[in-house]
Amino acid sequence: MSTVDLFAIGNALIDQEFKVSDEFLTAHHLQKGTMQLADGEAQATLYQNLKATQTYKGQASGGSAANTTVAFAALGGSAFYACRVGNDDLGHIYLHGLNEAGIQTTTQSISEGVTGTCMVLVSPDSERTMHTYLGITAELTDEQIDFQPLTTAKWLYIEGYLSTSETARQAVKQAREIAKANGVKIAFTLSDPAMVQYARAGLDEMIADGVDLLFCNQQEALMYTETDTIEAALAKLKELSQYIVITMSADGALISNNGETFTVPGRAVTAVDANGAGDAFAGAFLYALNVGLGLKTAAELAILVSSQVVAQFGPRLAVSEYAALLKDVLKECA
């Protein structure tokens, strides 16, 4: 196995995307813009209701950190993804898709069980609401992870969705220890307002004594710090991380590195589907930092890539699109 720049740990999920009405979300008690966990029976029931009454848009490999890793690799970075899938059709499809995107995986990720699924419900305002059955990924342990690539990586990336799993949190703890012992920087994302609201203790455990780079959106930042303004939230987040990146949807992003803080405006697009936008942002930002492009260029690239994800259905762009976007940003920032 060759060395990689990015070692990511996250859930492995197959997305089923639907266009839905606001009334459908209300009727099924789904809070718009958040992720809700479900068991297999509830997932199957919702899927049948969706197929019967809403508009099906297709299936795609998902998982927050996986989407981030795909963006990182598609831009030219080398990456490894640690996850857990079932020994079923969806599991093999999932790992094959990562390998096709140039991402290294291990057969240790495959075990008996059912691969997780996520119903991605896109409302008329393009916001995504997720109903997730984690399946076997809820039982991710260090036994499914080959930590060797982490010892020589430059970045460890951890998704906040893992906060709901005790075994996954233990695996993250081990990954953090290996990263620190080998001088690997740690990036973390809060992932979702629901994680902040319902799994705060798990997030705190994984962030532990701090990280090098923290990603969150505006709502997550305010909720996690229990503040009313971004300025106040940023002051508290600086206690946890050197780099802070707060995304603000169409308004762009706020970037902080020690004493330097600046904002980069968003890109105007016709929003279709917000699913995966934050993930793509993180992947592009990490790639740019990793190759030494600087914070402002990293933010410009991340905003451009994520804006293109928002302008289409599905959490990932075609691999061929990333190189063109990188070229555009480098030309603009020259």
State what each model feature region is.
Residues M1-L13, K19, A27-L37, T53, ...:
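Conserved phosphate-binding/catalytic region of the ribokinase-like
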Residues A42-T117, L134, D328-E332:
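Substrate-binding N-lobe of the ribokinase-like
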Residues A79, T105, I186-A187, I244:
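Hydrophobic beta-strand scaffold residues
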Residues E100-G102, G135-D142, P193-Y198, E226-T227:
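Short gly/ser/thr-rich secondary-structure transition/capping motifs
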Residues Q108-I110, V120-E166:
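Conserved phosphate-binding/catalytic loop of the ribokinase/pfkB sugar-kinase fold
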Residues T117-L121, G252-I255:
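Short beta-strand scaffold segments in enzyme catalytic cores
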Residues P149-T151, I207-A208, K238:
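A short, aliphatic-rich alpha-helical micro-motif
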Residues W155-A232, D251-A253:
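Conserved beta-alpha-beta core of the PfkB/ribokinase-like small-molecule kinase fold
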